[in-house]
């Protein structure tokens, strides 16, 4: 890119992460940016050079090259925008912006002109692929306006920024889905304090991220059942960990299932409008889709359903919430 700009008679210089430097911690493969020293690049810019910075990489405080992991390039762009107090950070992708849902599944999905940081963060964390959660969280922390644009089409894209007025116009902003889900159920766990801490603490030691959790009374008196979801890619590790601690926990039965999908609706209007959960659950019921697990946040409702129904669920919910208008 730097060479191409030079051929257009534009002065440009390329920078590796260590040359900037972009300082990170030592977690190789998923390093976290700690600081960006701006003096070198700023001096180059003042001399008329366009700065081309490699994403996805940094250097630790003991001078080891690190990589930032998934979403590292977008995160680098946002971090640079924050460090230089830029008015906006533009992210060019293979799509024209952020859509109400996956347009490959719902043909009438609409491109959003605007979405808040919180909504985008929820959509990204629940399976939307446009941006990774790290870049959105960083933009939200430093109040960097983000714009998602297409590399192939000259269209306005989607602006991601702080909440604006008239946020009650739509009940929800978007629908996300995650196919990388596994459901685990532990049955007949002795009902006593500390059991959940023991189970999830053991999983955390092996970096297994637990998402949706449901605990209910067992048919056997004095026992409880616990169901939770994890990334399907972590299922084998989770099975080994749980079998290892079975003696300490005392559960009677372990079951796992992978043919499940998480569907999430997201919108700031949930803070002030009632009936959104009702609409979601009634829509799924009318289409004979059984809900296995439910989890909520202030602006999100997620349900776990059988994978054979996820496309039907997304299309039905998109229609029910008038997102195609």
Model regions: which residues?
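Hydrophobic anchor at the start of a short beta-strand
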Residues: 12-13, 89, 146, 210, ...
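A conserved regulatory-domain signal marking ACT and ACT-like small-molecule sensing domains
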Residues: 156-325
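Nucleotide/pyrophosphate-binding catalytic subdomain
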Residues: 1-136, 305
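Short, ordered loop/turn segments at secondary-structure junctions
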Residues: 17-20, 56-57, 93-98, 103-104, ...
């Amino acid at each position: 890119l730097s060479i191409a700009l030079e051929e257009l008679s534009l002065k440009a210089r390329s920078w590796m992460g260590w040359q900037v430097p972009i300082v990170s911690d030592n977690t190789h493969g998923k390093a976290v940016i700690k600081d960006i020293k701006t003096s070198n690049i700023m001096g180059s810019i003042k001399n008329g050079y366009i700065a081309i910075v490699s994403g996805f990489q940094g250097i630790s405080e003991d001078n080891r090259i690190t990589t930032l992991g998934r979403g590292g390039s977008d995160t680098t762009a946002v971090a640079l925008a924050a460090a230089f107090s830029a008015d906006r950070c533009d992210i060019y992708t293979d799509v024209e912006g952020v859509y109400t849902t996956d347009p490959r599944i719902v043909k009438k999905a609409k491109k959003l002109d605007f979405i808040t940081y919180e909504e985008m963060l929820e959509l990204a964390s629940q399976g939307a692929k446009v941006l990774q959660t790290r870049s959105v969280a960083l933009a939200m922390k430093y109040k960097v306006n983000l714009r998602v644009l297409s590399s192939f089409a000259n269209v306005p894209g989607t602006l991601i920024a702080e909440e604006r007025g008239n946020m009650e116009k739509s009940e929800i902003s978007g629908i996300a889905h995650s196919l990388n889900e596994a459901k685990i159920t532990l049955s007949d766990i002795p009902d006593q304090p500390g059991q959940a801490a023991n189970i999830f603490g053991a999983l955390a030691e092996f970096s297994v991220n637990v998402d949706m959790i449901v605990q209910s009374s067992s048919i056997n008196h004095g026992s409880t059942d616990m169901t939770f979801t994890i990334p399907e890619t972590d299922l084998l590790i989770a099975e080994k960990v749980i079998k290892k601690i079975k003696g300490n926990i005392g559960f009677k039965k372990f079951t796992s299932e992978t043919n499940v999908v998480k569907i999430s609706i997201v919108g700031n209007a949930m803070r002030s409008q009632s009936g959104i959960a009702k609409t979601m659950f009634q829509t799924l019921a009318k289409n004979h889709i059984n809900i296995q697990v439910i989890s909520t946040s202030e602006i999100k409702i997620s349900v776990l359903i059988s994978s054979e129904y996820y496309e039907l669920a997304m299309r039905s919910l998109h229609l029910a919430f008038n997102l195609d208008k």
